[in-house]
Amino acid sequence: MSRFLRPAFRLATTATRASTIRPTPSSLITKAAAVPTTRLLQKRSYAAEATGVKEYTVREALNEALAEELESNPKVFILGEEVAQYNGAYKVTKGLLDRFGEKRVIDTPITEMGFAGLAVGAALAGLQPVCEFMTFNFAMQAIDHIVNSAAKTLYMSGGIQPCNITFRGPNGFAAGVAAQHSQDYAAWYGSIPGLKVVSPWSAEDAKGLLKAAIRDPNPVVVLENELMYGVSFPMSEAAQKDDFVLPFGKAKIERAGKDLTIVSLSRCVGQSLVAAENLKKKYGIEAEVINLRSIKPLDVEAIVKSVKKTHRLLAVESGFPAFGVGAEILALTMEYAFDYLDTPAQRITGADVPTPYAQKLEEMSFPTEQLIEDYAAKMLRV
């Protein structure tokens, strides 16, 4: 067991940004902006040179994961709004109704409280439901079922009554949908005992983490991102097999480096990789980029090991700054690697405001490649 799993008091920090460091409108997080990141990864990926590698979108990877689990386990079923006849709001469940039938792929009324309650009840009865939310913003209607029923039953029953359920759907930034559809709930669910929380970035992340979630006896929250569904990644031959799963609590080093550690999750990983390449081209800086994959459990050992090598830490997330994932990462780094830091650890987050609908204001509400680059350059004094 990791020596980093002991309880600890959490630190609250306030980051003051320099007036010269501001998001650039041209760096708006969009689907188009995600494409260069993918091309960059294809050039540097070991998988791109291997035999049997195929291109998968994140959507296709999720669809394949669901199909494989439905095929292999009769206890697995999917329910949610428009998941069946419409093939899902984002087409993640495309073709599954035709293949597995209406008893395994179930359309529900527009009532998150209702179908989440049905899903939790089914899990307590021994089935393994995959409960899709059209967006995790709507899951607030079902928060009692997730937090009080699914997350707590195993503990309250003394380990007798498991609740094998997967909650999945898009989370975080989604361009042009304003305050009630753009929130990042990683910190919310990550703070709840009894829940496991993952947030995929690449196609391999999406498939491996979703399959692991469905197979896990605990309730798992899978936080996807709407803007990543259509982005393509190389999928290794191993990841294409139906036994491919990724372990929880294990981060992945997407880019090795020696000067700075950038820890990120979900689509911010791609932004961090673009910023890291720009830092190398402009200043010769080699930044190490860590893809968390798993929020709870968190791979503290990977973060600490990297910080001991680079002596600098920058956490990047799209959530609100107060009590967020970045704040937790900084607090843990202070506890376990403080003596190795050459400069105070920093974090980049979404703005502490409800997400504006106006495009120019929206652009300034989330991390951008330029903002990450500026923060890193300031930390390294270049």
UniProtKB/Swiss-Prot annotation:
Is Cytoplasm among this UniProt entry's keywords?
no
Q: Where is the transit peptide?
A: 1-46
Q: Which GO terms describe its molecular function?
A: metal ion binding; pyruvate dehydrogenase (acetyl-transferring) activity
Enzyme Commission code(s) on record: 1.2.4.1
Enzyme class label: oxidoreductase
Q: Which Pfam families match?
A: Transket_pyr, Transketolase_C
Query: So which cofactors does this thing need?
Result: thiamine diphosphate
Instruction: From the Swiss-Prot or TrEMBL record, state where the protein is found.
Output: Mitochondrion
Entry-linked InterPro entries: PDHB_mito-type, THDP-binding, Transketo_C/PFOR_II, Transketolase-like_Pyr-bd, Transketolase_C
Q: Provide the residue positions that the database annotates as binding K(+).
A: I165, A213, I214, D216, N218
**Gene Ontology CC terms:** mitochondrion
Report the catalytic activity. Answer: N(6)-[(R)-lipoyl]-L-lysyl-[protein] + pyruvate + H(+) = N(6)-[(R)-S(8)-acetyldihydrolipoyl]-L-lysyl-[protein] + CO2
Determine if Metal-binding is one of this entry's keywords. yes
Instruction: Quote the SMART domains the UniProt record gives.
Output: Transket_pyr
Q: Tell me, which GO biological process terms does this entry list?
A: pyruvate decarboxylation to acetyl-CoA
Q: Which UniProt keywords apply?
A: Metal-binding, Mitochondrion, Oxidoreductase, Potassium, Pyruvate, Thiamine pyrophosphate, Transit peptide
Binding-site positions, thiamine diphosphate = E112
Function per UniProt: The 10-megadalton pyruvate dehydrogenase complex contains multiple copies of three enzymatic components: pyruvate dehydrogenase (E1), dihydrolipoamide acetyltransferase (E2) and lipoamide dehydrogenase (E3) and catalyzes the overall oxidative decarboxylation of pyruvate to form acetyl-CoA and CO(2). Within the complex, pyruvate and thiamine pyrophosphate (TPP or vitamin B1) are bound by pyruvate dehydrogenase E1 subunits alpha and beta and pyruvate is decarboxylated leading to the 2-carbon hydrohyethyl bound to TPP.
Subunit relationships:
Eukaryotic pyruvate dehydrogenase (PDH) complexes are organized as a core consisting of the oligomeric dihydrolipoamide acetyl-transferase (E2), around which are arranged multiple copies of pyruvate dehydrogenase (E1), dihydrolipoamide dehydrogenase (E3) and protein X (E3BP) bound by non-covalent bonds. The Chaetomium thermophilum PDH complex contains 60 E2 units, 12 E3BP units, about 20 E1 units, and 12 or more E3 units. The units are organized in 1 E2 60-mer, 4 E3BP trimers, about 20 E1 tetramers, and a maximum of 12 E3 dimers.
Q: What is this protein called?
A: Pyruvate dehydrogenase E1 component subunit beta, mitochondrial
